[in-house]
Amino acid sequence: MSMSAIERVIPLVGHLPPSIREGLARRMRELAGLGLIALSGLASAALMTWSVQDASLSHATSRPIRNILGYAGAIGADLAMQILGLGAIMLVLTVAVWGWRMMTHRPFDREALRLGSWILCTVIAAGFVSCWPHGGAWPLPTGLGGVVGDALVRAPAVIFGPPGMIYRTVLGVILFAAMAATFLIACGLGAREHDDELAEIEDDDKPLDEDEESDRGSVSLGWLFHALMSTKARLIWLCGAAYRSLVSSGPKTRAVGFSRQEPNLGGGRAAPPISPRSEDEDYEEEHEEEEDEEEEEEPAARAPRKKAAPKAAAKKSSDKFELPSVSVLAAPKAGDRQPLSKAELEANSRALEGVLQDFGVRGEIVKANPGPVVTLYELEPAPGIKSSRVIGLADDIARSMSALSARVAVVPGRNAIGIELPNAHREKVYLRELLVAKETVDTVAKLPLCLGKTIGGDPVIIDLARTPHMLIAGTTGSGKSVAINTMILSLVYRLRPDQCRLIMVDPKMLELSVYDGIPHLLTPVVTDPKKAVVALKWAVREMEERYKNMAKLGVRNIDGYNTRLLELKAKGEEPTRTVHTGFDKETGKAIYEEEKLSLDPLPYIVIIVDEMADLMMVAGKDIEGAVQRLAQMARAAGLHVILATQRPSVDVITGTIKANFPTRIAFQVTSKIDSRTILGEMGAEQLLGQGDMLYMAGGGRISRVHGPFASDDEVEKVVRHLKTQGQPEYLEAVTAEEPTEDEDGGAVFDASGMGADGGGDLFQQAVAIVKRDRKASTSYIQRRLQIGYNRAASLMERMELEGIVGPANHAGKREILVEEEDSHM
């Protein structure tokens, strides 16, 4: 059935979109094929129940009719048997094959040739069966081929004489060959056509699963329902468009309750954006300008380091410190949000139902929840529909709905499956509207982070103090770096430097360098991977120091510690603690002194690492060990870690790191494997990028969030304001390692953190031990200096390079090349 024929039957089809018209044509063709198969089935039933005793045009009787189709079936079957005999079977069989070809979308061209071959095949079939004797069981006076068959057999007898057995056999073979040839032509089963149809058959059958092919009858009913629902959805859309055109001619008013534009998935054209440039272009160009400017700028001169405790930083100016104003941030524009009528949502829902029916998924869209970037359609599946089957159709749903991508997931706690489709008009999420939202203003979070908006447009505010650490992954351009910027701005907009300090590690030297010089920093932005290891080791020591102070006051976390300090300060008491300062040279006994504890509250410390992969390449074991200890123990001490990487592979996000970071954020990734690495399940590869993320809370619950955007200019304005509030009080010990101290964690941190020229005093001690004891082995140096094996091995390699010891022999022993009385350096 051609498209023009359908348009003549249904005038409304000409007004439908091309995708709907094409789908409707396919459904009508399938319905026609189903009708032909049903017609051939009825004809076969009439022929199978034919009886010569039934009433017909050539026989009158009062006996009841035994034909299954009644009087009409008896007359039709009798005519077919009288004229064609058993050759009528070929008449019905060819029609059934035509119906099968139409249902499976195989081509049916050259209709005149098909019909002519069909008639000729039926006549030849009647002659073929008339070649064989019927005996006495045949109730008709004619042969097995009826009147037509007898005429075809007896016609050559005029030339060759009365037909004998040999004549009938030869004629039967010839007629059989002719019947087979005409049958293949009538059915379109020729060799050339078969080869041409293979590709089309594969394309048509590809979206269907194996279990669906066995249920084409029930699926055909779904196709009919789809056609009806699509037509209904189009009518609703046309009525809505006419209504909007009338409303737009009058005074423009904003509809209450609608704040964002949704896609017209029914096939109509989406309204063009008001601004000449789309949000996606603004997002990409502003982010590229940020990277270009930071690459061209020379490293700014860093402020001189001052050795001061972190709790004393910005203490003098804390009372006068002024938090940044939200006025420097961009506000939402009036044209960014476009309402969507309920009629359009209803039309999209019905179109989605039709697509699901195409793939054999029965159910109903019970709710459409529009959001700033995507719309969530909740499908209530029919009994017996597996959720895994619907989830596996995500790519097919996106293709059928003409969407960039589609994400399908089960709605927790409900008998519903969520289908997330992107909006035609993407709304930009602004950081300003999140900072002034009621959820942010009224929050009691210690370290509030503005993550973005949910699918429904609600703000998402989390407390990093309760998280307590975060792992972020995403490819280039997915919005990972912008999300880190918005997290930093969320902290500096709410907390003063005496409440929260920051340690920023940026091996790429691009993303976080703009924050260099703000009062919240404990140290200048760390760009050297080796110094990053030292900074993480300092964080471990700071954590242990805080735990000792908490144990002295009998508290369990940093909030209790600060509260106890305020109570002691109000009472005028000065707490002390016992500190081991050394040993008596004469007696060898340990010396302890009483040290007063400061009454200044301890600030939170947030460690931000922008690119984890670069650090793992330089010092993987050091980083993994330090991050593990911080993630396991630092929560109560007020230290929190945010790790980000653009390469979420197993060699970067190791099992140890993953186990200690229950809170994770996945932006768009390139493959399902990367999504499983960061989240443990698929879905991140179907995100839209540019701030679209999947947020996994500590309990394993995953929700989709659309992150806010902060431009380069906004970040620079906030940084300039912070710099006017005071100079940063840097702590030199953060990046300056003290190698003379014995490290309990020596087995955790290897020698890569001290560098080629670091640890000079420790090296001198190792040389003195070798010259004095005349023993040179890694394990001996490790035991004497109480350090880790990696560091001891590094010291031995350096002594070999400087000619103090020789290379190890086959037994692992080294020759000492310096005399005992010699002094090195």
Swiss-Prot record:
ATP binds at G477, S478, G479, K480, S481, V482. Its main location: membrane. Residues 254-318 are annotated as: Disordered. The chain crosses the membrane at residues 32-52, 79-99, 118-138, 146-166, 170-190. Keywords: ATP-binding, Cell cycle, Cell division, Cell inner membrane, Cell membrane, Chromosome partition, DNA-binding, Membrane, Nucleotide-binding, Transmembrane, Transmembrane helix. GO terms for molecular function: ATP binding; ATP hydrolysis activity; DNA binding; DNA translocase activity. GO terms for biological process: cell division; chromosome segregation. Residues 279-298 have a biased composition (Acidic residues). Pfam families: FtsK_4TM (PF13491), FtsK_alpha (PF17854), FtsK_gamma (PF09397), FtsK_SpoIIIE (PF01580). Residues 457-676 form the FtsK domain. It is found in: Cell inner membrane. It is a multi-pass membrane protein. Residues 191-825 are cytoplasmic. It comes from the Bacteria. One of its GO terms (cellular component) is plasma membrane. Homohexamer. Forms a ring that surrounds DNA. Belongs to the FtsK/SpoIIIE/SftA family. Essential cell division protein that coordinates cell division and chromosome segregation. The N-terminus is involved in assembly of the cell-division machinery. The C-terminus functions as a DNA motor that moves dsDNA in an ATP-dependent manner towards the dif recombination site, which is located within the replication terminus region. Translocation stops specifically at Xer-dif sites, where FtsK interacts with the Xer recombinase, allowing activation of chromosome unlinking by recombination. FtsK orienting polar sequences (KOPS) guide the direction of DNA translocation. This is DNA translocase FtsK. The lineage of its organism: Bacteria, Pseudomonadati, Pseudomonadota, Alphaproteobacteria, Hyphomicrobiales. The gene is ftsK.
